[in-house]
From Swiss-Prot:
Task of the protein: The glycine cleavage system catalyzes the degradation of glycine. The H protein shuttles the methylamine group of glycine from the P protein to the T protein.
Classification via Pfam families: GCV_H (PF01597)
Stated family: Belongs to the GcvH family.
InterPro entries: 2-oxoA_DH_lipoyl-BS, Biotin_lipoyl, GCV_H, GCV_H/Fam206, GCV_H_sub, Single_hybrid_motif
Keyword Cell inner membrane: no
Name of the featured protein: Probable glycine cleavage system H protein
Length: 143
């Protein structure tokens, strides 16, 4: 896994974060490159959901607003909405997940990415949580 990784434990759950990503209160991560954000769910989220058995992907070309539910991940435990961390247009989806949803469990920050957004306002990225802020967000919810 590229990028610096930190391991954290909150309420008995050990999970990894990457220092080069930004995060949301609803457990998504985003990586911004050349105006396009790659989005997935955090290691913490996949551990909470347990075995992921299905994914509903957004349509390419769909315009989305920050905070809008755009995808769904189904696990043996629950179904979770995945929210757009930034406003823009869906330009790519990870179709591998349709046959291999477990990639989200196996590699949430790599092969398990869910969709990509061409971002309307790259400045919006700075409003997302740093790894440290995300850990605090998880602590507030879990402890």
């Amino acid at each position: 896994m590229g990028g610096q990784v930190i391991e954290v434990e909150v309420a008995g759950v050990r999970f990894l974060l990457r220092k080069d990503l930004r995060y949301t209160e609803s457990d998504e991560w985003a990586r911004l490159e050349d105006g396009v954000a790659t989005v997935g769910i955090t290691d913490f989220a996949q551990k909470e959901l347990k075995d992921i058995v299905g994914v509903e992907l957004p349509e390419k070309g769909r315009k989305v607003k920050k905070g809008e539910a755009v995808a769904t991940v189904e696990s043996i435990k629950a179904t979770a909405d995945i929210y757009a961390p930034l406003s823009g247009e869906i330009v790519d989806v990870n179709e591998k997940l349709l046959d291999q949803p477990e990639l989200i469990n196996d590699d949430p920050y790599g092969e398990g990415w869910i969709f990509k957004i061409k971002v309307e306002d790259p400045g919006e990225f700075e409003s997302l949580l740093t790894p440290e802020q995300y850990v605090e967000s998880v602590r507030k919810r879990k402890e």
